[in-house]
Amino acid sequence: MPRRREVPKRYVLPDPKYNSKLAAKFINNLMRRGKKSLAEHVLYGALDLIEQRSKQDPLDLFHKAMENVRPVVEVKSRRVGGATYQVPVEVRHERRDALAMRWIINYAKQRTEKTMIQRLAGELQDAAQNRGGSVKKREDTHRMAEANKAFAHYRW
């Protein structure tokens, strides 16, 4: 966190195929070692596979999956007088998207399908239908915040 001035926000250009900023950010999150064309291939392949399987607009399903995984509240550790409390705090909009993308990608990697395209397609379809590991992670996060609601007055 800079002390002198606020760092200007970098804006991501929309992706070439769907013209979606969210898809472009997802590609950047999916990318490893600078291999952007490979990350694009994986996401576009997953969205094409979703279109073949469900006969729905894949971008709508992608947005629905993201909406179902975005957390509203999370807990942050706060030390007060020798004790550490898990304090529930509201999640900023940018962080909601970042967490949702991270969770979808991580739980897609843990799936048992053969290729990453199939894993990502499966996780996105599950998330759009409110099931799957990434949705469970969001529910666990919300449950933790609900359980620690008593410490909400320690917010900063």
Curated annotation (Swiss-Prot):
InterPro entries found in the cross-reference section: Ribosomal_uS7 (IPR000235), Ribosomal_uS7_bac/org-type (IPR005717), Ribosomal_uS7_CS (IPR020606), Ribosomal_uS7_dom (IPR023798), Ribosomal_uS7_dom_sf (IPR036823)
One of the protein's GO biological processes: translation
Key word tRNA-binding present: yes
Domain of life: Bacteria
Pfam families on file: Ribosomal_S7
UniProt xrefs under PANTHER family: RIBOSOMAL PROTEIN S7
Self-association state and partner proteins as the record states: Part of the 30S ribosomal subunit. Contacts proteins S9 and S11.
Described purpose of this protein according to its UniProt entry: One of the primary rRNA binding proteins, it binds directly to 16S rRNA where it nucleates assembly of the head domain of the 30S subunit. Is located at the subunit interface close to the decoding center, probably blocks exit of the E-site tRNA.
Family per record: Belongs to the universal ribosomal protein uS7 family.
Protein name in UniProt: Small ribosomal subunit protein uS7
Organism in which the protein naturally occurs: Syntrophobacter fumaroxidans (strain DSM 10017 / MPOB)
Organism taxonomic ancestry: Bacteria, Pseudomonadati, Thermodesulfobacteriota, Syntrophobacteria, Syntrophobacterales
